[in-house]
Curated annotation (Swiss-Prot):
EC primary class: hydrolase
EC numbers, comma separated: 3.5.1.14
GO BP term, pick one: amino acid metabolic process
Subunit composition and interactions: Homodimer. Interacts with SPHK1.
Catalytic reactions on record: an N-acyl-L-amino acid + H2O = an L-alpha-amino acid + a carboxylate; N-acetyl-L-methionine + H2O = L-methionine + acetate; N-acetyl-L-glutamine + H2O = L-glutamine + acetate
Family: Belongs to the peptidase M20A family.
Gene that encodes it: Acy1
Name of the molecule in the record: Aminoacylase-1
Xref: NCBIfam families: Ac-peptdase-euk (TIGR01880)
Main localization, broad class: cytoplasm
Cofactor(s) in the UniProt record: Zn(2+)
Subcellular localization: Cytoplasm
Lineage of the species this protein comes from: Eukaryota, Metazoa, Chordata, Craniata, Vertebrata
Species of provenance: Mus musculus (Mouse)
Binding site for Zn(2+) 1: 80, 113, 175
Length: 408
C-alpha cells in the first residue's frame, strides 16, 4: 500500500530511493558511489562481494549467495548501474532526488531502467535469507557498468573473462520493460543493433552548375532504398495484430554529414542509420542487401559498421524447457499473465545469450507506462514492492530447479 508518512515508508522503498540518488548518469557515472552502496548491501546481507575491473575504471560487482549444491550451474541476476542522460528542464522534479509524490509515484532517472530491478533482486534475497530458506543452486547478482552506451566496457568483456566462467551460470535474468496493461512482458530474445554509416563520394564543383555524379545524388538513392525498406517493415507490423515491434526490423536515419559551404558541391557526404535487426533475419543475406543498395546507387558508395551484433539467440519459451517451466510456473502460481516478446532494442542479455546461457528479460512493472529514457521517468511504490514479491517467488523456483541432464 502507498505510504504517505515518510516515517512509515517501506524499508525496501527507502533503499530504492537511496540507490536512485546515486548519480550514475552517462557520460560520467558515479560508479564508485554505486559500488560502495553495493558493498554495504553485501555486508548487511551476509553475501560475498567480488569486484572485477574489466578495463580501468569499469568494475563488475558480483554478490553471491551460495547454494547447497555448488556443483550445479547457478542462477545469474544481471542489472546495470548506469542510467541515460536527462534534460532537467523537462522534469517536474529533480531526476536524482527520487522525489515521491502524494500518490506514491517515485520520479527518478533509473526508476524503470533499471535500478528498480537491482533493488528487487537484493530485497528478494534479503527476504528469503531472513526466512531461513536455502536452495540447491547458487545465486549470483551482477551489477555492471556501461550498458546504456553499448556494454562494450561492461558485459561484452565480462563474458569473455575467467571470472565470468567461474560463475557457472545456467540461467540468467536481466531487464525488461514496463507494460501499461495488467499483463507482464517477458523478453526471450532481442533485435541486433547495427549502426551503419554510408559514405558517398562524387564530383565536387561550384553550386551554380548542374554537376553530374554528385555525392548527394548517390547518397539520396541509398537513403531512398533504406527508407523504402523501413516502410515495408512498418506496414508488415501494422498489418499483423499478432506481431510485436521486436519481431520486425526497424531502421532510422540518425545523422547526415557533408558540405563545407553553401556554394560548394561536396565531394563526400555520409548518412548514418540505426538498424535493429530481428533475430530471425539471415544476417549474411541482410548485409548483402546493404551492399546491393550501395552498388545500385553508383560508384564510390560504401558502408561501414560502427556497431554490428550478429549472434542473436532465442531462449526457449515452451514448457518442455525446464527453465521456462520454472519461470512461467512461478508466475502462474502468483496469478501473473505473461506476454512473451522479442525485445525491440538491445540489452546486456545479448552477450549472455551469445555465450550459450539462456536469459529472460523481465522487469515486473505492469499497469505502468513505458518511460525508460523519457522525461519524468517514474514508478509507483506499490508496483515496485509487488516486484519484490514477484522476484521472491521467481528466485525460489529457479534456484530450486533440480539437476538437469548434462549437469554435474
Amino acid at each position: 500500500m502507498t505510504t504517505k508518512d515518510p516515517e512509515s515508508e517501506h524499508p525496501s522503498v527507502t533503499l530504492f530511493r537511496q540507490y536512485l540518488r546515486i548519480c550514475t548518469v552517462q557520460p560520467n557515472p558515479d560508479y564508485g558511489g554505486a559500488i560502495t552502496f553495493l558493498e554495504e548491501r553485501a555486508r548487511q546481507l551476509g553475501l560475498s562481494c567480488q569486484k572485477i575491473e574489466v578495463v580501468p575504471g569499469f568494475v563488475i560487482t558480483v554478490l553471491t549467495w551460495p547454494g547447497t549444491n555448488p556443483s550445479l550451474p547457478s542462477i545469474l541476476l544481471n542489472s546495470h548501474t548506469d542510467v541515460v542522460p536527462v534534460f532537467k528542464e523537462h522534469w517536474h522534479h529533480d531526476p536524482f532526488e527520487a522525489f515521491k509524490d502524494s500518490e506514491g509515484y517515485i520520479y527518478a532517472r533509473g526508476s524503470q531502467d533499471m535500478k528498480s530491478v537491482s533493488i528487487q533482486y537484493l530485497e528478494a534475497v534479503r527476504r528469503l535469507k531472513s526466512e531461513g530458506h536455502r536452495f540447491p543452486r547458487t545465486i549470483h547478482m551482477t551489477f555492471v557498468p556501461d550498458e546504456e552506451v553499448g556494454g562494450h566496457k561492461g558485459m561484452e568483456l565480462f563474458v569473455k573473462r575467467p571470472e565470468f566462467q567461474a560463475l557457472r551460470a545456467g540461467f540468467a535474468l536481466d531487464e525488461g520493460l514496463a507494460n501499461p496493461t495488467d499483463a507482464f512482458t517477458v523478453f526471450y530474445s532481442e533485435r541486433s543493433p547495427w549502426w551503419v554509416r554510408v559514405t558517398s563520394t562524387g564530383k565536387p564543383g561550384h553550386a551554380s552548375r548542374f554537376i553530374e555524379d554528385t555525392a548527394a545524388e548517390k547518397l539520396h538513392k541509398v537513403i531512398s532504398s533504406i527508407l523504402a525498406f523501413r516502410e515495408k517493415e512498418r506496414q508488415r507490423l501494422q498489418a499483423n495484430p499478432h506481431l510485436k515491434e521486436g519481431a520486425v526490423t526497424s531502421v532510422n536515419l540518425t545523422k547526415l554529414e557533408g558540405g563545407v559551404a553553401y556554394n560548394v558541391v561536396p565531394a563526400t557526404m555520409s548518412a548514418s542509420f540505426d538498424f535493429r535487426v530481428a533475430p530471425d533475419v539471415d544476417m549474411k543475406a541482410f548485409e548483402k542487401q546493404l551492399q546491393r543498395w550501395c552498388q545500385e546507387a553508383g560508384e564510390g558508395v560504401t558502408f561501414e559498421f560502427a556497431q554490428k551484433f550478429t549472434e542473436p539467440r532465442m531462449t526457449p519459451t515452451d514448457d518442455s524447457d525446464p527453465w521456462w517451466a520454472a519461470f512461467s510456473g512461478a508466475c502462474k502460481a502468483m496469478n501473473l499473465t505473461l506476454e512473451p516478446e522479442i525485445f525491440p532494442a538491445a540489452t546486456d542479455s545479448r552477450y549472455i545469450r551469445a555465450v550459450g546461457i539462456p536469459a529472460l528479460g523481465f522487469s515486473p512493472m505492469n499497469r505502468t507506462p513505458v518511460l525508460l529514457h523519457d522525461h519524468n521517468e517514474r514508478l509507483h511504490e506499490d508496483i515496485f514492492l509487488r516486484g519484490v514479491d514477484i522476484y521472491t517467488g521467481l528466485l525460489s523456483a529457479l534456484a530450486s530447479v533440480p539437476t538437469l541432464p548434462g549437469e554435474s
